[in-house]
């Protein structure tokens, strides 16, 4: 299945209806990043392991039957100016190389809810 051209609403619906898992979606995106990143250089930081861990958590949570947010299980890319506790927030400068935040910014928490 080529999910690249599907709108986010369709991806979310397929995840809710168990036609697609977060792991499958993330594996697809990882394959595309692996294929094109050396030429595009779009990522300041990319952690495949963390992405797949979060996808596994999302799929497990979905199976529990508990209420989910509309974007549950959909991976979201953030600019490195958005504060996160589990990824570097370097703001595009070597002065902040490897710096992380003690907590997520409000927008990150909203996206995760």
Features from the language model and the residues they span:
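Gly/Ser-rich catalytic/binding loops embedded in alpha/beta enzyme cores
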Residues: 2-113
């Amino acid at each position: 299945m080529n999910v690249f051209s599907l709108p986010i609403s369709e991806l979310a619906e397929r995840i809710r209806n168990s036609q697609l898992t977060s792991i499958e979606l993330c594996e697809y995106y990882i394959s595309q990043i692996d294929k094109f990143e050396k030429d595009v250089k779009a990522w300041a930081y990319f952690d495949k392991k963390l992405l797949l861990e979060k996808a596994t958590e999302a799929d497990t949570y979905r199976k529990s039957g508990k209420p989910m947010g509309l974007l549950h299980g959909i991976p979201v890319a953030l600019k490195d100016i958005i504060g996160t506790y589990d990824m570097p927030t370097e703001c595009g400068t070597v002065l902040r190389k490897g710096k992380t935040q003690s907590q997520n910014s409000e927008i990150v928490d909203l996206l995760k809810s």
